[in-house]
């Protein structure tokens, strides 16, 4: 009996697909066939011995597959699922499974023979559910169920992870974990208002819901922070990655016909906080991006509370800095603001000597000191979380981490961050992006990062100028001897040489000329302008000056550049200036590529 599938189970499911998509369907046992990964989920064919149907498991069950609990050719019982059309193929269906349990491990082969009725398993649902909208659920709990609620018999509450744009009606039970302000907008179609809320269900899954105009005015006062609601009659679409604030592929829109009812007079729930941790050594790719990140680390130090004056209203707000480290042997400074600085920040200061592990959700990544993290209004800090990641991190720190030499993640990026407000690992573009957009930098300079090779350095160009040793400004030869600095209004007997040169760079998409000044040019050439001038003055069979320039070519660098417009003979031209130069960190480059691949997979 245990090694049997439900006879005609798939046919039964398909025969009842006209039921409301949120209805409780019969539990059936199927065989898992052709199990394979698809992004962060797994797909397979559900087999009942006679028929097959394509199916998808949620990401929450990936751990069961990795551990071997769910196996290819094994049997599973489908507890909660929906049947949907494959877009563009109305004749084909697929099952989106939200809850299942393993029945048997892998069988010797795929079940193909027709199964006798006596061996089938047709399980009835364990519970009977009453079909109802959000308002009807509340009315029933208050003892005044509407007639429509008594007529329908199968509606249930959906977990957020099960929602998709192809479903019909659904009802969710969620807590408001963040509420935005009412904003106004103006476009070609007129004026309007909009606001957003972030909703979290009992499993910790989050989704952003947006309301416009009439819906915004209707629900703005109804939604209150921290309260739990039943919501139905909304719509879903793919989330706009540029504006989304939570980890969900979809976003929700509520209109004036949507139903939102507070779940009062019943047992409440506290959502489980789900984290998607980013290792500290990978934070550079998120600098000044819209993405909010989660981080976990061991507390290295905690500063006293300081007061910072806010620019927009001159109000003094509390701030506290903490330094975190993780197994990548990198550290990062996290700024706690407002109540987090004075509340949980004080707790961390009191226990700093014990080096607790903390997990922080929803952090903004900035470019101060190369890379830094800051809390925002929706940030959540958990001290010594009960999680495998925290246990592993604490064990590493106690065993070896506390004796390990650490370095700040932003130490190699600070110069670039100070000259363009971004790190070397954000705003990465190919040269063709710049050369094919001649209008870049018309209004103000724009900044990019690019990886390119030095392909040519013109040897007969003016590569340096005479500079004052005090202020680095240009000097002129004095009438009698020495050099005169107009800026310092003084004469010196000696001056220094400082680079001002042009270099041609190339990548796989094209080439262009960059202007490089002293500090950046020294990193490119590998010596000071004074040293290069000495080589140029030397005589001998080997031209050391030319050799030095050749050594500098066909070497790869990470460049932080600014693009501006310069007028020459009444014609505007692009001027591309080097603001920072760094050697290639191949480990960081590999992580960047892997992250891009992961993002592309997620978007597909």
From Swiss-Prot:
It holds the Pfam family REPA_OB_2. It is found in: Nucleus. GO terms for cellular component: nucleus. One of its GO terms (biological process) is response to UV-B. The keyword Transport does not apply. GO terms for molecular function: DNA binding; zinc ion binding. Its main location: nucleus. Belongs to the replication factor A protein 1 family. Component of the replication protein A complex (RPA) required for DNA recombination, repair and replication. The activity of RPA is mediated by single-stranded DNA binding and protein interactions. Probably involved in repair of double-strand DNA breaks (DSBs) induced by genotoxic stresses. This is Replication protein A 70 kDa DNA-binding subunit B. The lineage of its organism: Eukaryota, Viridiplantae, Streptophyta, Embryophyta, Tracheophyta.
């Amino acid at each position: 009996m245990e090694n049997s599938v439900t006879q005609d189970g798939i046919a039964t499911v398909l025969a009842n697909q006209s039921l409301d998509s949120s209805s409780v369907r019969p539990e059936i046992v199927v065989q898992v066939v052709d199990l394979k990964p698809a992004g962060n989920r797994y797909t397979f064919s559900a087999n009942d011995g006679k028929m097959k149907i394509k199916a998808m498991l949620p990401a929450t069950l990936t751990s069961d597959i990795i551990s071997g609990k769910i196996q290819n050719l094994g049997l599973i019982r489908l507890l909660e699922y929906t049947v949907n059309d494959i877009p563009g193929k109305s004749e084909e269906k697929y099952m989106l499974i939200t809850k299942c349990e393993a029945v048997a491990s892998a069988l010797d082969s795929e079940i193909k023979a027709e199964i006798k009725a006596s061996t089938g398993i047709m399980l009835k649902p364990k519970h009977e559910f009453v079909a109802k909208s959000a308002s009807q659920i509340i009315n029933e709990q208050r003892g005044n169920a509407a007639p429509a609620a008594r007529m329908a018999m199968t509606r249930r509450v959906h977990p957020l992870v099960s929602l998709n744009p192809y479903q019909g009606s659904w009802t969710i039970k969620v807590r408001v974990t963040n509420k935005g302000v009412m904003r106004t907008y103006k476009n070609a179609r007129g004026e309007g208002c909009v606001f957003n809320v972030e909703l979290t269900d009992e499993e910790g899954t989050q989704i952003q819901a947006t309301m416009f105009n009439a819906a915004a005015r209707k629900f703005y006062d109804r939604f209150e922070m921290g309260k739990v609601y039943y919501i139905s009659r909304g719509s879903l679409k793919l989330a706009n990655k540029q504006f989304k604030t939570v980890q969900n592929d979809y976003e929700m829109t509520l209109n004036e016909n949507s139903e939102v009812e507070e779940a009062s007079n019943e047992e409440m729930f506290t959502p489980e906080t789900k984290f998607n941790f980013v290792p500290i050594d990978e934070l550079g790719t998120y600098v000044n991006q819209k993405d909010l990140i989660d981080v976990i680390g061991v507390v290295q130090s905690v500063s006293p509370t300081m007061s910072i004056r806010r620019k927009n209203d001159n109000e003094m707000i509390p701030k506290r800095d903490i330094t975190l480290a993780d197994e990548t042997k990198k550290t990062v400074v996290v700024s706690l603001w407002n109540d987090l600085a004075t509340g949980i920040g004080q707790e961390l200061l009191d226990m700093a000597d014990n080096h607790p592990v903390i997990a922080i959700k929803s952090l903004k990544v900035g470019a101060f000191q190369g890379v830094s993290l800051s809390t925002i209004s929706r940030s959540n800090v958990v001290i010594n979380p009960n999680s495998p990641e925290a246990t592993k991190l604490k064990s590493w720190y106690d065993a070896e981490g506390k004796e390990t030499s650490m370095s700040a993640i932003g130490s190699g990026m600070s110069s670039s961050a100070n000259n363009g407000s971004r790190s070397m690992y954000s705003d990465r573009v190919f040269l063709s992006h710049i050369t094919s957009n001649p209008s870049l930098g018309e209004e103000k300079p724009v900044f990019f990062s690019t990886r390119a090779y030095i392909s040519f350095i013109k040897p007969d160009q003016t590569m340096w100028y005479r500079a004052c040793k005090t202020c680095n400004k240009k000097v002129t030869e004095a009438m009698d001897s020495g050099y005169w600095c107009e800026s310092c209004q003084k004469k010196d007997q000696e001056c220094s040489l400082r680079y001002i040169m042009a270099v041609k760079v190339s990548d796989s998409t094209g080439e262009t000329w960059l202007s490089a000044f002293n500090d950046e040019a020294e990193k490119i050439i590998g010596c000071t302008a004074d040293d290069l001038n000495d080589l140029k003055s030397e005589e001998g069979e080997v031209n050391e000056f030319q050799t030095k320039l050749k050594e500098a070519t066909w070497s790869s660098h990470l460049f932080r550049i600014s693009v501006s417009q310069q007028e020459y003979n009444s014609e505007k031209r692009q001027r591309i200036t080097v603001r920072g130069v760094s050697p290639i960190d191949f480990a960081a480059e590999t992580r960047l590529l892997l992250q891009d691949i992961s993002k592309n997979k997620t978007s597909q």
